[in-house]
Design a protein with these regions (language model features):
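N-terminal cap/lid segment of alpha/beta-hydrolase-fold proteins
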Residues: 1-25
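Active-site glycine-rich loops that stabilize anionic/oxyanionic intermediates
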Residues: 31, 39-42
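Conserved alpha/beta-hydrolase
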Residues: 44-76
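Alpha/beta-hydrolase active-site loop
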Residues: 81-102
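Alpha/beta-hydrolase-fold enzymes
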Residues: 111-198
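Short beta-strand/loop motif that positions the catalytic acidic residue
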Residues: 218, 224-226
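Short alpha-helix in the alpha/beta-hydrolase fold that links the catalytic acid
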Residues: 234-244
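Catalytic active-site module of serine/aspartate enzymes centered on a nucleophile-bearing elbow/loop
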Residues: 251, 255-300
Length: 300
């Protein structure tokens, strides 16, 4: 029977309280800890089955919600200070620091989905990571979107979303069936049309505060996984993100749905339980031993 998660309360450096979930087993210095960083406006509960699976394989696992989302949502989103920069430098940092404080002698790994991979790049404690795995990770530069879907995506995410956000004071994603409701500052960072994160509103502010992004000092080996049918995460988008990790030995593993005998995977389905056998071991094997786990996927 899967272990039930424990509710977590994680306090960021600015005092904001984040909600999360933890899967913990018998303590031991060799048992690694993995922190999972979610995609933009995806509740951390979405990753619960994957977290339970990873826990059964020998990791303790921490999930958390960014400020404004899920277990970390306040009563009112309008006026909430929350940007992609805050989600990385404050919230992802808080989760990694929490893991280090609770388990100071354990190996620490990180998994990032979509924006979650970029959140790791902005967290100072990422320098302490042993290994990193990302899935569909990028920071939404519009020219990197898949050519056949680029303009509809630009219209939706870079025109309609910021306009609706300006009218409402936050993005009412639930009502539209797009995402969770999302803070305005996050939408601003996402929709900004520049290819470098440091030229986006949150990125500029963060660079002034940090001097450089923590990713520059990260040395943990990094496996970046993408799929050929993910319109957000093209090879150009992955390489754009990996360029911020110059000291990390990195490998980009690109998977076609046909490699595992399915019609589609897309941007979100990697963590669906139907891919427990075909895709999850790519991450699990990498974290466990640094294995490239290319049995089911082809590198491109």
């Amino acid at each position: 029977m899967p272990t039930a998660p424990q509710p977590l309360a994680i306090e960021a450096a600015d005092g904001y309280r984040l909600g999360g979930l933890g899967w913990f087993g018998a303590p031991g210095p060799a048992r690694p800890v993995a922190v999972i960083h979610a995609a933009t406006s995806v509740q951390c509960r979405y990753y619960s089955r994957f977290a339970a699976w990873l826990h059964a394989r020998g990791h303790d696992v921490i999930l958390y919600d960014y400020r404004g989302i899920g277990l970390s949502r306040p009563a009112r989103l309008r006026g909430l200070r929350a940007s992609w920069a805050d989600w990385g430098a404050r919230d992802a940092e808080a989760a990694l620091a929490y893991a280090r404080a609770c388990f100071p002698d354990r190996p620490l790994d990180a998994i990032g989905h979509s924006f979650g991979g970029w959140a790791i790049a902005l967290a100072p404690s990422a320098v302490h990571l042993r290994r990193i795995a990302t899935v569909g990770a990028q920071f939404a530069y519009w020219r990197d979107y898949a050519a056949g879907q680029r303009w509809p995506m630009v219209l939706k995410w870079h025109v309609a979303m910021p306009l609706i956000t300006a009218l409402c004071g936050y993005f009412p994603g639930k009502r539209l069936g797009w995402l969770e409701d999302t803070p305005a500052g996050v939408v601003r960072d996402w929709a900004w049309p520049t290819p470098r994160f440091e030229t986006r509103p949150g990125g500029r502010r963060l660079l002034r505060e940090q001097g450089r992004y923590p990713a520059a000092a990260v040395r943990a080996p990094l496996l970046a996984i993408s799929t050929t049918d993910d319109p957000f995460c093209t090879p150009a988008a992955v390489e754009r993100m990996l360029a911020y990790f110059p000291a990390s030995p990195s490998r980009h593993l690109r998977i076609a749905p046909g490699d595992i005998g399915v019609a589609q995977i897309g941007h979100f389905a990697f963590f669906h339980s139907r891919f427990e056998g075909a895709l999850w071991p790519l991450v699990g094997d990498w974290l466990a031993a640094g294995a490239e786990a290319s049995r089911t996927a082809s590198a491109r």
